[in-house]
Amino acid sequence: MPRLSEVITALDALWPAERAESWDAVGTVVGEPDQEVSRVLFAVDPVQETVDEAVGLGADLLVTHHPLYLRGTTTVAASTFKGRVVHTLIKNDIALHVAHTNADTADPGVSDALAGALDLNVVRPLVPDPSDPEGRRGLGRVCELTHPLTVRELAARAAERLPATAQGIRVAGDPEATVRTVAVSGGSGDSLFDHVRAAGVDAFLTADLRHHPVSEARAHNPLALLDAAHWATEWPWCELGAAQLDEISDRHGWDLRVHVSKTVTDPWTAHVASAPTSSAMGAPN
Amino acid sequence: MPRLSEVITALDALWPAERAESWDAVGTVVGEPDQEVSRVLFAVDPVQETVDEAVGLGADLLVTHHPLYLRGTTTVAASTFKGRVVHTLIKNDIALHVAHTNADTADPGVSDALAGALDLNVVRPLVPDPSDPEGRRGLGRVCELTHPLTVRELAARAAERLPATAQGIRVAGDPEATVRTVAVSGGSGDSLFDHVRAAGVDAFLTADLRHHPVSEARAHNPLALLDAAHWATEWPWCELGAAQLDEISDRHGWDLRVHVSKTVTDPWTAHVASAPTSSAMGAPN
Amino acid sequence: MPRLSEVITALDALWPAERAESWDAVGTVVGEPDQEVSRVLFAVDPVQETVDEAVGLGADLLVTHHPLYLRGTTTVAASTFKGRVVHTLIKNDIALHVAHTNADTADPGVSDALAGALDLNVVRPLVPDPSDPEGRRGLGRVCELTHPLTVRELAARAAERLPATAQGIRVAGDPEATVRTVAVSGGSGDSLFDHVRAAGVDAFLTADLRHHPVSEARAHNPLALLDAAHWATEWPWCELGAAQLDEISDRHGWDLRVHVSKTVTDPWTAHVASAPTSSAMGAPN
Amino acid sequence: MPRLSEVITALDALWPAERAESWDAVGTVVGEPDQEVSRVLFAVDPVQETVDEAVGLGADLLVTHHPLYLRGTTTVAASTFKGRVVHTLIKNDIALHVAHTNADTADPGVSDALAGALDLNVVRPLVPDPSDPEGRRGLGRVCELTHPLTVRELAARAAERLPATAQGIRVAGDPEATVRTVAVSGGSGDSLFDHVRAAGVDAFLTADLRHHPVSEARAHNPLALLDAAHWATEWPWCELGAAQLDEISDRHGWDLRVHVSKTVTDPWTAHVASAPTSSAMGAPN
Amino acid sequence: MPRLSEVITALDALWPAERAESWDAVGTVVGEPDQEVSRVLFAVDPVQETVDEAVGLGADLLVTHHPLYLRGTTTVAASTFKGRVVHTLIKNDIALHVAHTNADTADPGVSDALAGALDLNVVRPLVPDPSDPEGRRGLGRVCELTHPLTVRELAARAAERLPATAQGIRVAGDPEATVRTVAVSGGSGDSLFDHVRAAGVDAFLTADLRHHPVSEARAHNPLALLDAAHWATEWPWCELGAAQLDEISDRHGWDLRVHVSKTVTDPWTAHVASAPTSSAMGAPN
Amino acid sequence: MPRLSEVITALDALWPAERAESWDAVGTVVGEPDQEVSRVLFAVDPVQETVDEAVGLGADLLVTHHPLYLRGTTTVAASTFKGRVVHTLIKNDIALHVAHTNADTADPGVSDALAGALDLNVVRPLVPDPSDPEGRRGLGRVCELTHPLTVRELAARAAERLPATAQGIRVAGDPEATVRTVAVSGGSGDSLFDHVRAAGVDAFLTADLRHHPVSEARAHNPLALLDAAHWATEWPWCELGAAQLDEISDRHGWDLRVHVSKTVTDPWTAHVASAPTSSAMGAPN
C-alpha cells in the first residue's frame, strides 16, 4: 500500500504545482506524508458534505478541484466551517490534495473532460500556455462539433450530459442559431471573452456569467453564450482524474480504490421559471 | 415645455449625484442643457435596443439605471457599440441621464421598488447610509412578509411579479423552509452577505450570485438565497422613477409624457432544465 | 469618395496606434465608419474653435495632434466644453481622429516638422524607439545647423519661422553663445533633460518649460534653452500630416480636399515686457 | 549677537515647520546651532549665485523660499551642483534655512507680498487652511482692485511692479476685459484652477502655466490668466521676510544686518517676440 | 468541566481580539467549541516542543503569545513544521488559542509582567492606546526603579530575574551610567525608539535589537539599551496569564489545572565570548 | 599626489556603483573632485567617532562600508548627528566615499574577507550575481572547512579571529554537531535562509539574527546558526579594501598612506550572561 507522499508525487506529475496561477493555492492541504493510502475520493468542492462522504467511504485521501483556503487563513478552528473540515479530515486520518488552475490548463485537463462529456472535438487550448512548446496545455478549449447543432440543441445536450443541477443551462443569443465551433471553459469564465472573440467561435459554454459581462459580450458580436452550473462544468474532471489515478495505481501495483463523489455540491436546490404571463410586463423577448 | 437642464435638476433632487459611490458614473451623459423635453423613457440599460425604442417613441430624454461608461472612455467612435449609442442619441437629439448607486440608496430607491413588486413590507435599509440622520437611505432593504411563505412560494411570487426572463429564479437552501423576513437588493448582491447575515433574515433575494460566494454563504448558515435576473430586479425602479417624474411634471405643469421601456434587455434568451435522469450521475440533491 | 474607415486605415499606417505611449489616447474619437469623407482639416487642438472652423469649412474629418479625452470620461454631455465639441461634431457629421505620441515618434513626425520649419538638419531621434531596427523613429530630434548661429539668432529664426504667438520665444543661457547642434521636441519637453544632456548639444528648443526644471538644467551645464509656445511647436506637423494625406489621396484617387487649420489655439493672447527700470529691483541679469 | 538656534526659533515662529505640506522639505538645511549670526540674506533660490552673493556679503545665514533638496539626497558631493552649494556654505560658515509652503500659507505670506507689490487689497485666502480658526492663513489670495483695470493694464502694472525678468507677463483671455477681482498665487499655480473658478474672480495671476491647463481653464470660462516669472512672483516675499526679521532683531536687540538678494535667479535671460508677419501663418488671434 | 467556548470567552475578556493590531492573527487557531477543558498550558511559542509538552501533560488547551500563522496559510499539511503542529494538536484533542498584540497592550499585559519580573514600578504605557480613557493600556511600559542602579547592575538583575538563555543580556551605552527610569517592551522593540526618546528615560530594555537602529539610537542621545532574548522578555507573561486564568477558574468553579511551559524555546543554545586579546584588533572600546 | 576624482575612479573600478542594489546609496557622499588625497582611512561606519579618528589622523578620504544617508535626506544641519558628520568632514577637507552592496557582491568582497578571517575555503557565492558570466560575484559565500569542526569550535574560532565585541558569538543548534560546510554573509543575513537551505551547508554565520526567523529556520532543518556582531563581520573587508587600495597606489605611484580604523563602532559595550540558576525557571535547554 503506497504512502501519501508517493501518491502525491504521482498527482503532482499529472498536475505540477508550478503550473498553477500565482494567486492560486494548490497542493497538499492536510495529511501526513507517511500515512498509508488505499482508498481515494475525487470531488469538486472540499466541503463538509464531501468530507463526510469520504469518512463514510473510509477514504484515506480526498482530491478536490477547488482549494480549501484560496486566500490563506490564520486559523483552522472548528468554529469556522472550513476549520471543521480540517478537524474532520485530521481526526479521520484523511489527507486533502488540491489540483486547481494547474488542472485547468493540464493536457488533459478540466476543459478536456468538459468537452468530452459534451462529445466535442478539442482543436486547441483557448488560452495556450506559452511555456508549452507543443501548444496543448492552456485554459479552456476551442472545439468543433462533429455535426452542427442549434444553440438550443447544444444546450439540451449540455443539460442531458452534465450532472443534473437545479439551475440547468441558461442561454444568451438566438436559440436557433447554428453552432459548428464552440469554446468551453470549466468554472467562472467571464474573464475570457476577449480570447473567445479572438477564437471566432459560434458559442461559448462556461459558468458564473453575470449581467454586465454577458450584455457587453452580446453587444460586441452575436456569439451565443451557454451558462451551466459552475460545479457541473468541473465535475467531469473528477471522473478524468480518477481514471488517471486508477491507471497509475495499476502501473505501480498500488491496488488503490479510486471513487468519484456522488454528492452534488452545486448550491442551487430549486428553480422556478418565470410565468409566461408574468404580471409585470410580458414574456421574455 | 421644460428645458433639459430643468428636468435634470428635478432628477438630481430625486437622486443627488453626490450620493453615488465614488467609483460610480452617474448624471447626464449626453444632451444639450437648453434642448426642450416633452417625452421621457425610463429603462435599466443604455443599450442600442432601448435607444432605438427611444427614437421610435420620439423621446427627448432616456433615463437609465446603468451607466454607459462606468470606467471612463477616451473614444465615442461609432465603431464601438457604446459609441454607436452616443451617435444615435445625439443625431436624434435624445439626452441620456443615469441614476445608479444614488438611486440604489435613495428613499424610495431601487430596492424599495423591488420590495414593492414582491409585496414585502420594508423595515429598514440593509446597509444604512451613515449620512442620513433618519436612517431611511441605504443599500438593499430588510423586509417582512405579511404572511410567512415557504422559500419555494416566495420564489414563485418573484417569478410571477418580476418581469419574465428566460432565467427565472434560482433557489439555494431548503425550498420548504419558512420565510418571515427577507433582505432584497437589486442588481449584483454577492458583496452583501456579511450585512445579510448580521440582519438575521430568513432569505436574501438579489442577482448575479456565483458558485463560491453562494457555497460559502450556505456553509456559514442556512440562509435561503433567491437569484433573479439582474435586469428583472432593477426594472421595477423604472416604474417607480417614471411615476416620480410624472408627479413632478404635474406639479410644474410640464405636461411630460413619461414612458417605461418594454424592451427586455436581460441577456438570457432561453433556459434548458437538467433532465431528471441526466446520464451523468443523478438528480440534484 | 472614400469612407471614413478607409481614410482611418491610411492614417493608422502613417501613425500606428500601437506605437503610442501606454498612457496616451489616440485613434478615432468620433465618427461612423461608413460615412463618406471628401474634406479633411488638420489642427493641433480638438477645441470648439477648430471644430467650428471644420463646420464652416464643410469638413468631414478633423485630425488633431492632442487627444480630446486623455484621461477617459464617463460623460459627453454638452454642459461640458468637451461634450459640446462631441455634440457639434456628431450633429455636423464630422469625424475626429487623434495622432499624438504615435505622431511624435513617427518618421517623419512632429519634431521632424518642427526641425524642418527651423531649417535644421535632423541627425537622429533624441530618444530612439528601441523597436525600430533602423533607429529613425523616436521622441525629439538631434539636429545640426548648416551654419552656426548665436542663441539669440536661433531664437529670432524660431520667432520668425514658427506660427506667431503672443508668447514669442523665451531664452535661458547666454544669448550670444554659439549654437552648432540643437535638440528639438514639440510640446512639453521638461522630462527630456537627461537625454538632451547625454546628446551633448549646444541648445534645446521645446515648450512648457517651468522654473525648477530650467534652473536645475542650467545648473547642470551651460545648455541654452529656447521655450516656444506649445501649440506653435506642434503646428508644423499639421502641414506635414496634411501633405502626407494629400499624397495618399492622390495615390488612391480619393480627390480629398485637405486643409490646415488657420485658428491659433495657443491660449496666450498678449505679452507685456518687464519695464527695464521696473520699480522692484533692476533689469534682468 | 544671537546664535543660529535663536534666529531659527524666531523664523520658525513666523513660518512653523508643521504648517508645511507633507511633501515639502523646510527648516534648517545647513549650519551649526551655536554659530553666531550678524548678517542675513533673503533669496528665492538656494543656488550657487545667491550663495556666492552671501559669501561676498559676509552673511552668516541665507534664508530661501525654495528648498535645496525637495526629494531627499543620499550625497552632498561637490561634483553635484547642489553639493557644491553645501560645500560653499559650510566652508564659509553660512547656515541655510528654508521657508517654503509654510511661508506660502502664512499670514502674511508669499501671496500677501505678491498682492502688496501689485497694490491689490487682500480679501481672503484662495485655499483657506482648515486649521486656522480665523480663516486668514491659506494658499493664494483673493483680492480686489481699488479701481477696475483692463487685463492689459493689470499686466502692465505687474510688469512694472514685479522684479524685471526676460519673460515679462504672458496674458490669456481678452486683454480689454475689465478686472475688479483677482486671485494671486506665487510660484506654480496650475493646480489651483478649481479654487480660482469657485472664487468667481475676473483674473488669476500666477506662474509656470502650461498649454493644456490654460487651454482647458479658458474653455471652462472666460477667466483672464496672467503668467509672470515664477521667481518674480516670489521675490516680494524676500522683502517681506527681511522686514519681519528686522523687526524681530530690533525687538531682541540682536542688531542683525538683514539683506535681500539682488541676484535675479529667474532662468530666462532673453525674449524674442513673434514677428507680426511670421512666415508661418499670421498674427496671433 | 467548562467547554472550550466558555474558556475562550474568558480569555477574550482578558485580551479582546479587537484590541489586536490589524496585521496580527490572534484568537482560537485549533479546537472544537464543545470540547471539554480541564488542563491548560501557557507558552510563548506554538512550536513542536511546547505542543509535545502539552501532549505529555494531557493538556486540553495550549495558550501562546506568538501566533502560529501570522501571515495566513493555504495549507496545514504535516510536511510543513507548522502543519505538523496542527496535526499533533487535533489528533490529541488539544485546542490552541493566541493572545499576541492584544496581550501586549492589555492592562496588565506582557510588559507589565516583564516590569514585574525586574522589580520595576510601572508609571504609564510607553505608547498609550488612544481608545483607553484611563490611559492604562498600551504598548510597552515606562517604569521607575525604587533605587537607582547602574546600567551594568540593571543588566545583571535582568540576567538573574528573566529565564536563563544562552544569549544573556547585551548592553549598549556606558555600563556605569545611572538608571532611575527605564522603558521596557517585550519582544522586538526596535520600532519604538521615537517613543522611548520622547519618554526621556535613562534606559530601554527590549529584544531583537539590530546594528543600524541601535547605532542611530545611540547617536541620537546617550540612552542605554539592554537587549534580552525575545523569548525571555515574554515568558513572564505566561506566568501572569496562567495566574489570571487560575483566578477565573476558581471564580467559575471550573477546577482548571493551569500550567506554564518549562520548555525554553529561545533558539540560542550557546554563547562564546570574544577573546579579550582577539587576534583581529583589540578589546571592545 | 592624486586628486580625489582619480582615487574615486580607482575605488569605482573595485566596486562599480551600478552593481549596488537599487535601494542602496553608494558612491561619493562628501568631497571636492579636485582636492588632493595623501592619507585614506577605511572604516565600517560613517559615524562621529570614525570621522574624528580621520581628523586626528589627518586623513583626506574616509571610505566606509555603510552609507551615511541610505534613505535620502533633505537636510545636513549640524543639529542632526549625521549633519554634524557632514560639517566635520567638509570643515576638515575630508571626503567620504561609500562601497556597500557593490562591495558585498564584489570578487573579492565583504564575505570573502569574512571567510578569510575565519580560515574558510570559498567554494562559490551563496547568491550568485546573474550578470557575472564567471559566477564569482554574488552575495555571501559557501565555504568548506579544511578540517571538520564542531559548531562550538567554529564559534570559538569566530570569537577569536573576528574583532572582539561585547556581544561575542551567539549559537543556535547542537553545539557539538560537526561542521564541514558553512555559508557566511557579512551584515544582516536573515533574508538569506532560503538560499542557505538550498546550499545544503551545515552552518550559517551572519549577524542581526532575530527570534522568529531563527526559530522558523531551526524548525525547517537542523542547520546550525552563528550570530556575530554586525560590525565585526564587516570589519575584515576594511583590511581587504585598504590592501587593494595600497596596491593600486603603488601601481600609480600615488604614495598613499592607507589606514584601517581601530575604532570599534559596534554599539554593544557590555554583556551579562544569564545566571545558570536564574530565579525564573532553569538553565537553558
From Swiss-Prot, chains A, B, C, D, E, F:
Entry GO MF terms: metal ion binding
GO cellular component, one term: cytoplasm
SUPFAM superfamilies in the cross-refs: NIF3 (NGG1p interacting factor 3)-like (SSF102705)
Binding residues annotated for a divalent metal cation 2, in chain numbering: H66, H230, E234
Keywords on record: Metal-binding
Binding site for a divalent metal cation 1: H65, D104, E234
InterPro entries linked: DUF34/NIF3, DUF34/NIF3_sf
Residue ranges of the TM segments: none
Family note: Belongs to the GTP cyclohydrolase I type 2/NIF3 family.
Matches recorded under PANTHER family: GTP CYCLOHYDROLASE 1 TYPE 2 HOMOLOG, NGG1 INTERACTING FACTOR 3
Subunit composition and interactions: Homohexamer.
Protein name stated in the entry: GTP cyclohydrolase 1 type 2 homolog
Lineage: Bacteria, Bacillati, Actinomycetota, Actinomycetes, Kitasatosporales
